[in-house]
Amino acid sequence: MIDLPKICRNTLLVVVLSSITLFGCSNVSEKTEDIPVNSAQSDTLEKVKNGQLEGVLIGIGATKKEVLDKIGNPIESGNSEYGFTVYYDGFDLQFEDYANSIDEVKDTSKVVLMNAEPKTVGMTGKPEEIKKNLGEPSREFMDDTGDNTFILEYENSGNLLRFAFDSKESPVKYVTLRVQ
């Protein structure tokens, strides 16, 4: 005698298991292993997100008071494109205000831009080496408005990290981090 309910139950079980196997193994998968994130990339871009550069003790958004308390008096100072600039060994910081001297800059004036020497931030390579370390930039271009420098830009959380090179084959000339 044929046990019809048992055959139906077994058939249903086979269909359910086959469906789970078939649809549970879809072609859509995360490709995290295809995009390796090295620690240098992760650390550098995380610092940029927070307005900081490796080797610079202060970040974007720090006040004049915080800068002087943490780093001390600058080697040199004066006005520049973005505001009053203070120069230290290996980097400079630009405040949002203009002034004739550091004493005239408000204590609450904030750092809006920093320039650093490549050695200070530990990024001394050619453009391809920088891309290898940090990934593809948000933008790369030849700046023909002045000294024909080659630029790599990385945007992260409202901050812009810029690497300037004399050419596509030369090492980093300087590194800039600024508010967008």
Name what the model sees in each region.
Residues 44, 62-107, 121-180:
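A cross-family detector of function-defining hotspots
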Residues 51-58, 112-121, 150:
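Second-shell loop/turn segments in exported
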Residues 32-58, 63:
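N-terminal low-complexity, Pro/Thr/Ser-rich intrinsically disordered segments
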Residues 2-12:
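Bacterial N-terminal signal peptides that target proteins for export
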Residues 22-35:
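Bacterial lipoprotein signal-peptidase II cleavage site
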Residues 39-42, 47, 106-121:
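N-terminal short leaders/motifs
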Residues 14-21:
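Bacterial N-terminal signal peptides
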